[in-house]
């Protein structure tokens, strides 16, 4: 079995190493990912522009490739250029953050998996939901850091890929969207459907009360504060049962959502 692993957080992000470690006993692994963070970039593809490919090493010393492009670019380059044989499966992630609901169309992680499907390869998009109460910690000097605990994510991903290896990918779907909580009550994944949305979004400017907390970000060169706005977001807190959000956030268990790339709505017969 040959597996291509990519992500949108960048080739040196800890999640991509976790994904590799989860399945390296099951298949031959090739890692191809963007050279830097490309979160929320969706399915952008770089057409007719040069992309630089660099061979590099992950933290465990294993070989990987970085691409100066988007997550979808990395998948295309990996499948069509770097791999000798077409992979049997593409895994994208593990994303450092949640990817649920119909908002997944903006996710570089999920859209890289969608790109794999367009190339005729089944895929799994994997994300870690980090509970702010347990994932954000302080060191002995009082400095804050993020504790990326991929333990359960690696176990669930391993078991899922093992099932696919033994039984094949389900014929009726194109890809899986897997989200795993860092703070969990159950290790067993649940088959779910997409929630309507993940984020409540709001535009703020220098006149908003939230500006002191949310508007303090570095300016681009020669950029001034005047006429600047920022899109802020907060995680939706209420979800219907059997959705990915309810399973992940309320029930605190892994959510596995089967997806199809065909967005055709079959309900409309005549209009």
Which residues are covered by each model-predicted region?
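A cross-family phosphate/adenosyl-ligand binding-site feature
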Residues: 3, 14-81, 85-86
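Short, glycine-rich nucleotide/cofactor-binding loops
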Residues: 5-12, 103-104
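Short glycine-rich anion-binding loops that position phosphate/pyrophosphate groups of nucleotides
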Residues: 9, 37, 70-71, 95-98, ...
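Hydrophobic/aromatic beta-strand patches that form the interior of the parallel beta-sheet core
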Residues: 30-32, 65, 91, 122-126, ...
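Internal, conserved structured core segments that host functional sites
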Residues: 77, 85-139
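Phosphate/ribose-phosphate-bearing ligand recognition and processing surfaces
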Residues: 118-166
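C-terminal accessory domains and tails appended to enzymatic cores
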Residues: 146-148, 167-271
């Amino acid at each position: 079995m040959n597996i291509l692993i990519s992500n949108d957080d960048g080739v040196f992000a800890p999640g991509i190493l976790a994904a590799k470690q989860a399945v390296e006993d099951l298949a031959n692994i090739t890692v191809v990912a963007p050279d830097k963070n490309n979160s929320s970039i969706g399915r952008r593809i770089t057409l007719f522009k040069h992309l630089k490919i660099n061979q590099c090493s992950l933290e465990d010393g294993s070989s990987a490739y970085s691409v100066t492009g988007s997550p979808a670019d990395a998948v295309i380059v990996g499948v069509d250029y770097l791999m000798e044989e077409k992979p049997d499966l593409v895994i994208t992630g593990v994303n450092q953050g949640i990817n649920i609901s119909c908002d997944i169309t903006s996710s570089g992680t999920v859209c890289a998996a969608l790109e794999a499907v367009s190339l005729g390869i089944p895929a799994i998009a994997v994300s870690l939901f980090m509970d702010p109460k347990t994932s954000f910690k302080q060191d002995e000097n009082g400095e804050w850091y993020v504790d990326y605990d991929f333990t359960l994510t690696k176990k669930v991903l391993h078991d899922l890929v093992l099932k696919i290896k033994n039984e094949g990918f389900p014929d009726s779907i194109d890809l899986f969207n897997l989200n795993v909580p860092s703070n969990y009550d159950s290790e067993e994944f649940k088959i779910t459907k997409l929630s309507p949305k993940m984020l409540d979004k709001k535009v703020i400017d220098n006149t908003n009360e939230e500006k002191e907390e949310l508007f303090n970000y570095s300016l681009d060169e020669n950029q001034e504060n005047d006429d600047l706005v920022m899109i802020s977001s907060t995680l939706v807190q209420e979800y219907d049962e059997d959705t990915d959000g309810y399973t992940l956030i309320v029930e605190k268990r892994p959510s596995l959502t089967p997806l199809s790339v065909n967005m055709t709505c079959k309900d409309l017969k005549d209009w």
